[in-house]
Structure formats: structure tokens, C-alpha cells
From Swiss-Prot:
CDD domains: YihA_EngB. One of its GO terms (molecular function) is GTP binding. It comes from the Bacteria. This is Probable GTP-binding protein EngB. It comes from Streptococcus thermophilus (strain ATCC BAA-491 / LMD-9). The lineage of its organism: Bacteria, Bacillati, Bacillota, Bacilli, Lactobacillales. GO terms for biological process: division septum assembly. Necessary for normal cell division and for the maintenance of normal septation. SUPFAM superfamilies: P-loop containing nucleoside triphosphate hydrolases (SSF52540). Its cofactor is Mg(2+). GO terms for cellular component: cytosol. Keywords: Cell cycle, Cell division, GTP-binding, Magnesium, Metal-binding, Nucleotide-binding, Septation. Belongs to the TRAFAC class TrmE-Era-EngA-EngB-Septin-like GTPase superfamily. EngB GTPase family. Disulfide bonds: none annotated. Mg(2+) binds at S43, T65.
Amino acid sequence: MTEEQVLNTHNAEILLSAANKSHYPQDDLPEVALAGRSNVGKSSFINTLLGRKNLARTSGKPGKTQLLNFYNIDDKLRFVDVPGYGYARVSKKARAKWGKMIEEYLVTRDNLRVVVSLVDLRHEPTQDDIQMYEFLKYYEIPVIVVATKADKIPRGKWNKHESIIKKKLNFDKNDHFIVFSSVTRDGYDEAWDTILAEL
């Protein structure tokens, strides 16, 4: 079954931005959280999956997303864009505040079905990437690792880069790993199929 048969992915809008759980939507719609370091391509991933150019704002300035942004998709599903982590120019106080906000959402939100953890296919995972993956495994939160910016690497080297990332993350073979490009749309179908299977 394709995502188009299940929901109209083009019928999407930003619903609200929240700093804590008192602002979360109060219903039982399933949610998919998207986490990753600043400038990993979360906004481009959201826009590509939803077939929209500017629904999620892409920015040349890392660390721009400072709240949990909830996107309503056809009144059947929500994407939750969490603040990008690991950006040095953001103060330690702000990073600590974001970390607490992200942790509160990931640990306490009953609507959460799966976290899409985005990493950059071109580079080894950072310590922040590793900590996020370990955090999700510790709390037994389902996770899909999506390696972005695949178009920046020759296709013949994808497997090598994937192996490096998996080794660094101590990747659980039962989890899903998807190589993705918002430019070529590689990984688009696999990403939707994997997300929908978790709902």
C-alpha cells in the first residue's frame, strides 16, 4: 500500500509550535518525530515527503528551529520537527533548554510512534548523533535512521558510507536504515513505507 492510498500527503500544514507539553495538540493522532543535528536536512526531508517546497522552512542558518513544530498531514498523521542539535553558536543555556524540551517530548508523548533520526551520509556521526540514537534505544523508542544528502556522494560509495555510520552508531540490525536525497528523491518510497509501517 502506498502513502497516497493511505493519506493525502499534499494536504499538509503547520499546525502549531510548542515549547512544552502544555502546548501539544490534545488528541490521539499518531506522530512521527524528526531529529537530527543542525543543517542535516530535516526541513528538506519534510518538504520532499510532503511534496511541498516551503512548508518546512529551510535555512542557511543552523539552529533556526527552536520549538517543536507540529505538521498536520491530512488530519491522520503529524510530523514533529524537533530543534536541531549540536550547533556551536547557540549558547549552552539555550542548548540545555532545547535538550530538555526534546527529551520531555520523546519520553512522555503517548502519540509518538517512531523517531526518524537524520544523519549526513557524507560524514561520520557526531557525538550528538550517537547520543540521540543511544537515547532512543535506551527508552525503547522505535527509530528509523535516514542518511541524507546522498546526492553529494557517488552512488558507488553509498554502501561504504552506510557501513561507517552503522559501525559508529553501533546500529541495531533490527532498525531501518534509509539512504535519502531530497534532490533526486532516492529513498522517498522506502521512507514513506517504513514510516507508515510503524503507525
